[in-house]
Amino acid sequence: MNYRDGRIRGRLAVSKTRKMKRDRRSVVGVQKKRYLVYIGLFVLMFINYLDRVNLSVAAKSIAETYSLSPIDMGYIFSAFLWTYLVCLIPMGLLADRYGGRAITYTTLGLWSLAGIWTGAATSYGSLFASRLVLGIGESASYPAGGKIIREWAPQGERGIASAFLNCGAHGGLCVGSVLVGALILQFGWRESFYITGAIGVVMAIAWFALYRRPEQASWLSDAERALILSERGETAPRAATDMTPLNALKGLLRSPSMLALALTQGCAGYTLYLFMTWLPSYLAATRGLDVLKTGLFSAIPYGVAAILGLGLGWYSDRLLKRSTSSNAERRKLIAVLLLLSSVILATPFVEAIWLIEALISVSLACVATAMAMNIALTADLLEDGRYNGVATSLLIMGGNTFGTAAPIVTGYVVAATGGFSGAFLIAGVLLLGGAIVILSGARNPIRLASTPVVPASGRAAHVT
């Protein structure tokens, strides 16, 4: 009996693999203009993180202007995350209700104006308030981005589409680290915020004018539009057809897989925000670098993360096309990346600047790619694509709940110990924990209905 069952499972696996290969051949020759949307997501997140890194590079100048301590700067670094966290789920619900276009250009304009306000701040209080407004605007980026990916990306391209979204962030951090340093030296720290904010306003106008859903995009061929719509996955399970957004949110919160994804994102997000907020200060304090060199050495790990992230995003989609259990392959890849990123634990024990750069580059590239793959895995596991916006919100909330703590905890650790060794230790332990969580927790489909969807075999669906 076991032998017979094994043969049946083997035949089913071979049949599925052959079907996937036929599907892949069937889209050969279909245009890929949808990649313009993926590039648009890259640019969107590029500007998002350009505005974020501005504060990190300008931190030394701002601290001198207002006579701020490391603890004071820790609160300034994390201020935008407070409103960011509060607004994530509302922004996800708005993205699901109104789509990616309206929510994106509105909030992009808002956070760009908040960046300009940061440059115009005249006190610690106004500086803090400007970062709170920045958090409101930027909280929509990933929920809207996740919604746009579900609207535009066939399932076999969600990895690379998510990589474009996430790598735009690291491209912004890479270029911004150098660009903002040069702007500060040339014009001053206030002017750097004016210039980066103006770039965002221009992008908001462009997004309003150019972006449309596939159904309304006149520049798409009929064949490409049909391919996109056939794999969107917005048909709900029967029990969830009339589900309200609030009930959908409750269903997500009851899903063990959703909670595991969010916790994994948090373990990875702590390290990301540690680098994003304190990396320039770490390099300046421990290596005695000036503003321009600090920006340059901060840029290198982000550049590596952007390039490697796109490559690994493409590779994860290749795994999906070849494997009979694609979600398991993506999950395993995330765990491996988190384990590799824990090389940050070795940072306090090396002295050479090139070796420190290498360790940070590997850690940042792996953690950034793991977070991008987590977005793709969420879309893969979510059965009802109509609620991808709020699902992405919960995922990003997990990342940013931990991320909010990173700059504050690091500030206290640095103030108490006079160094960064303890900060790197905390990050490394969380990365190891995240690898365990993703392997053990995110194994089943994310269902919003209370009644499980049962396949023809009579057994509840399970992802291995």
State what each model feature region is.
Residues 55-56, 250-313, 371, 375, ...:
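Extracytoplasmic gate region of multi-pass secondary transporters
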Residues 67, 99, 120-126, 137, ...:
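Helix-breaking motifs and short loop linkers at transmembrane-helix boundaries and internal kinks
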